[in-house]
């Protein structure tokens, strides 16, 4: 990070960290990724894990709220508001496939994945839940990052099945993504506004974004 800033002062270094950036440990050593020591921000894999667990019914809205608040409390604001919020990548199954199949962990072998068939009913479930996941992705602080093809409902389990040729399939989901991106680009409160998380019932998560006295978090 120091070397990058010497040459490119306004460049941002985003790290591939799969856990909480402020508490990450590996090989018995606590990593100094946050507080300006190593990274400007990171890929937000924990968001993907918790969103899918919530939408698949593996955790409650209260659990999801607790996770979101923990990130908000643990991360310095510049890092928090620059998180790369992703739902899919080349290292994990596509979000629509995860939500359609319910396979968030314990995936079958590569041979079994190659033969796996997602039915129309499963796909419709995945479609509906993916749109909810994307709503969370766009409404929490950070930078929404869409893995190519997710905007058109592409499927894929683990590599290489999540790296398929791009095709325009689900136009409804594409239009929903256009609405979300337009809304976020238009409303500054979704970019740098304050965030408040609530769980009024066991299944309902509420995300409130607001600006206080005409000032955002910065």
Role assignments for model-derived ranges:
Residues 1-83, 136, 153-179, 187, ...:
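Active-site-proximal helices and loops of the catalytic beta/alpha 8
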Residues 14-15, 144-148, 188-194:
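Acidic/polar loop patches that form or flank catalytic/metal-binding clefts of enzymes
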Residues 194-198, 202-203:
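Short, solvent-exposed loop/turn elements at beta->coil junctions and helix N-caps
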Residues 94, 141, 184-191:
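Alpha-helix capping/termination and helix-coil
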Residues 215-218:
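Short, well-ordered beta-strand segments enriched in hydrophobic/aromatic residues
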Residues 68-158, 205:
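Substrate-binding clefts and catalytic carboxylate motifs of secreted carbohydrate-active enzymes
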């Amino acid at each position: 990070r120091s070397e990058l800033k010497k040459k490119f002062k306004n460049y941002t270094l985003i790290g591939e960290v799969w856990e909480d950036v402020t508490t990450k440990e590996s090989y018995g050593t606590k990593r100094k990724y946050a507080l300006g020591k190593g990274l400007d921000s990171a890929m937000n894999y924990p968001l993907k894990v918790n969103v899918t667990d919530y939408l698949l019914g593996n955790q409650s809205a209260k659990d999801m709220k607790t996770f979101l608040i923990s990130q908000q409390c643990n991360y310095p604001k510049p890092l928090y508001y620059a998180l790369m919020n992703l739902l899919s990548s080349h290292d994990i199954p596509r979000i629509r496939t995860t939500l359609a199949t319910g396979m968030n962990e314990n995936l079958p072998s590569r041979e079994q994945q190659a033969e796996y068939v997602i039915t129309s009913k499963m796909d419709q479930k995945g479609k509906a839940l993916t749109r909810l996941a994307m709503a969370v992705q766009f409404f929490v602080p950070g930078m929404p990052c869409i893995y190519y093809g997710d905007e058109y409902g592409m499927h894929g389990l683990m590599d290489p099945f999540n790296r398929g040729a791009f095709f325009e399939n689900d136009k409804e989901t594409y239009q929903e993504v256009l609405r979300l991106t337009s809304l976020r680009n238009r409303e500054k409160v979704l970019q740098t506004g304050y965030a408040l998380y609530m769980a009024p019932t066991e299944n309902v998560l509420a995300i409130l974004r607001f600006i206080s006295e005409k000032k955002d978090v910065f």
